[in-house]
Amino acid sequence: MALPILLDCDPGHDDAIAIVLALASPELDVKAITSSAGNQTPEKTLRNVLRMLTLLNRTDIPVAGGAVKPLMRELIIADNVHGESGLDGPALPEPTFAPQNCTAVELMAKTLRESAEPVTIVSTGPQTNVALLLNSHPELHSKIARIVIMGGAMGLGNWTPAAEFNIYVDPEAAEIVFQSGIPVVMAGLDVTHKAQIHVEDTERFRAIGNPVSTIVAELLDFFLEYHKDEKWGFVGAPLHDPCTIAWLLKPELFTTVERWVGVETQGKYTQGMTVVDYYYLTGNKPNATVIVDVDRQGFVDLLADRLKFYA
């Protein structure tokens, strides 16, 4: 039986590819998709969800737009990474359908209530919508199997020296998620910076030759350009968000540890830092499965295999 998931995302090139991977995988049943503000403004990320589902001919999936700003802060966006539209590069179709006439939290709650079994929430943007859901619907916590997030890092940040972008945008929301008591899986920069797509991988995807694989290759063409900056020291571009979906599909490709994680919300230099108690120094009981490594070639092979679904 397919695993029911609810995807909360802020497309974003890597979010878009996470959507592609999830919808090409019969092991997963995508119940709904909600949009968060982060990689671009809330209007643009919602539009990008609709554009991707139009491309994939999955306009049957309910979509709703989320919070327009973080819980306690002004919104920061990553337009320097993802471009003016949030999905610069390929020519994507205009949406052929509209979002639901409700908020992201309302759609999430409805999805959880109506599901016969607990739902896995996959969140690949800031955690604002998920935190709002947890705070406003404590009666539905038991309907959440786990929360798989792309965010954080045990080590170096990518937005500040200490903080990864998704957590930095709304650290208060991320702290609510980590301390919720619901199982959390964290795909942070420790693993996603190892899940790099090289130029030759992009050409492999392009050679598959269907419209979706071509779009994915064109998304990666744009994404690779940003990551050529020598400061990163990358061979390719880290494909952050699809790591969440890939872990659900093939956990054997990944190495994980069970640790306690907290989020710094006030530090002068460390706002948005995920503090991972790797050496069990706090005495706190582990609250997260932290993904720390990936079989890069296996990850690329999985993407290539699933892109053939769209032939």
From Swiss-Prot:
Example GO biological process: pyrimidine nucleobase metabolic process
- CC annotations in GO: cytosol
Q: Which GO terms describe its molecular function?
A: purine nucleosidase activity; uridine nucleosidase activity
| Disulfide pattern | none
Q: Where is the active site?
A: 240
Keyword terms: Glycosidase, Hydrolase
Extract the SUPFAM superfamilies matched here: Nucleoside hydrolase
Q: Which CDD domains match?
A: nuc_hydro_IU_UC_XIUA
Question: Enzyme class, one word?
Answer: hydrolase
Keyword Hydrolase assigned: yes
Hydrolase keyword on record: yes
**Enzyme Commission number:** 3.2.-.-
The family database entries (Gene3D superfamilies) matched by this protein are listed as: Ribonucleoside hydrolase-like
**What domain of life does the UniProt record list for this protein's source?**
Bacteria
* Protein family: Belongs to the IUNH family. RihA subfamily.
Q: Name the NCBIfam families on file.
A: PRK10443.1
Q: Briefly, what is this protein's role?
A: Hydrolyzes cytidine or uridine to ribose and cytosine or uracil, respectively.
What is the name of the protein in this document? Pyrimidine-specific ribonucleoside hydrolase RihA
State the organism of origin.
Answer: Shigella flexneri
